[in-house]
């Protein structure tokens, strides 16, 4: 069996101003729920996704109206835009003409060779990558006849079939996804894909469900895949506001130490010793730090005796008690604060540390560019 390609050894592929694959951080993606031809609504949703930390966004392009809207949408957003195309190569060409940053299309499904060539040539001319989207629920008939039902081997065979079509046209800016709604099937498919080729992998558990069930299912499946060193970009698919997809993705990547641009909350599970409303405080602080683009760790704890010591790794935190709380940095108490202003004081400290971290990052960036 071939050796598995670790995410850092995959081919780097440019998507707009980002690079997916190679020694680059995992990229968080989502997809809009609006009608793409409704430019105003689509842009508004993308803006909310940007604010939540989405780095690449995909839009459905089911018809010419949607394809014609791409150029207007592109002008008003700040993150790379992906066109989701099914079957009609002309829609892919229109999207590319409109300035799309990536096309999701399966070359084997869009007809004769001249149609595939037209899309590949247009993408090549503009430096636009193609994502091959293999889905267990829509495998080719000959593959289902061969294997009897969706299998990981069948999914990899499908991916290799589409990859070969592009490679035969000397096109190599390829990203591949191997999505299934069955968690075990998805894990096996991604692992076998990582052994079969070195193109970047887009991770996802498709049709995973509602906010609660889908979050659990996606975390179980994608967590196992990420832990194997597989995956260069991901989308959490939920039957929910797409902003929730981004939030879950950020938390998942943070859990594996794979996100350097997101804040982390540490909070205790509560017990009978607690004398403050810790749950509402933790939720308020979590919401406050949710859009920060720096790796600050914030602790909210309910026990002034054990709290600071239990969260030594936190950059800043509070340990509450009735009447007053302790404000601490890296496990060391900074000062006591009255309970009624405890959260506001914590927010002020968070702002200071986040600004320091952002300035430090800019300084490092300038040094690297010199």
Swiss-Prot record:
Enzyme superclass (EC): oxidoreductase
Pfam family, one: GcpE
The keyword Ribonucleoprotein belongs to this UniProt entry's keyword annotation: no
SUPFAM superfamilies in alphabetical order: Dihydropteroate synthetase-like (SSF51717), Nitrite and sulphite reductase 4Fe-4S domain-like (SSF56014)
UniProt cofactor note: Binds 1 [4Fe-4S] cluster.
GO BP field: isopentenyl diphosphate biosynthetic process, methylerythritol 4-phosphate pathway; terpenoid biosynthetic process
Keyword terms, alphabetized: 4Fe-4S, Iron, Iron-sulfur, Isoprene biosynthesis, Metal-binding, Oxidoreductase
Protein's pathway: Isoprenoid biosynthesis; isopentenyl diphosphate biosynthesis via DXP pathway; isopentenyl diphosphate from 1-deoxy-D-xylulose 5-phosphate: step 5/6
Function recorded in the entry: Converts 2C-methyl-D-erythritol 2,4-cyclodiphosphate (ME-2,4cPP) into 1-hydroxy-2-methyl-2-(E)-butenyl 4-diphosphate.
Name of the molecule in the record: 4-hydroxy-3-methylbut-2-en-1-yl diphosphate synthase (flavodoxin)
Organism: Bacillus thuringiensis (strain Al Hakam)
Gene from which the chain derives: ispG
């Amino acid at each position: 069996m071939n050796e598995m390609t670790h995410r850092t050894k995959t081919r780097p592929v440019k998507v707009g101003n980002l690079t997916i694959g190679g020694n680059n951080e995992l990229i968080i993606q989502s997809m809009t729920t609006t009608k793409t031809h409704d430019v105003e609504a689509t842009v508004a949703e993308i803006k909310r996704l940007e604010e939540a930390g989405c780095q690449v966004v995909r839009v459905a392009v089911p018809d010419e109206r949607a394809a014609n809207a791409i150029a207007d949408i592109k002008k008003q957003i700040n993150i790379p835009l992906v066109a989701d195309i099914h079957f009609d190569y002309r829609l892919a060409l229109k999207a590319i003409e409109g300035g799309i940053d990536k096309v999701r299309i399966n070359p084997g499904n869009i007809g004769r060779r001249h149609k595939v060539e037209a899309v590949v040539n247009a993408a090549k001319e503009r430096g636009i990558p193609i994502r091959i989207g293999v889905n267990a629920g829509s495998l080719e008939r000959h593959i289902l006849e061969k294997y009897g039902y969706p299998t990981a081997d069948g999914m990899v065979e499908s991916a290799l079939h589409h990859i070969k079509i592009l490679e035969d046209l000397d096109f190599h800016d390829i990203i591949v996804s191997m999505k299934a709604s069955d968690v075990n099937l998805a894990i096996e498919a991604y692992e076998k894909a990582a052994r079969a080729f070195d193109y970047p992998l887009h991770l996802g558990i498709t049709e995973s469900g509602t906010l609660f069930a889908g979050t659990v299912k996606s975390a179980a499946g994608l967590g196992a895949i990420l832990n194997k060193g597989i995956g260069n970009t991901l989308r959490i698919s939920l039957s929910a506001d797409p902003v929730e997809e981004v939030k879950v993705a950020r938390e998942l990547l943070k859990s594996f130490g794979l996100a350097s641009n997101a804040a982390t909350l540490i909070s205790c599970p509560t017990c009978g010793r607690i004398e403050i409303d810790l749950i509402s405080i933790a939720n308020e602080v979590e919401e406050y730090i949710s859009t920060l683009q720096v790796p600050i760790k914030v602790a909210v704890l309910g026990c002034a005796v054990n709290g600071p010591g239990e969260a030594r790794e936190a950059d800043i935190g509070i340990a509450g008690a009735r009447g007053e709380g302790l404000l601490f940095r890296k496990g060391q108490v900074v000062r006591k604060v009255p309970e009624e202003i405890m959260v506001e004081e914590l927010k002020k400290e968070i702002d200071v540390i986040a600004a320091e971290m952002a300035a430090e990052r800019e300084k490092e960036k300038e040094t690297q560019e010199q």
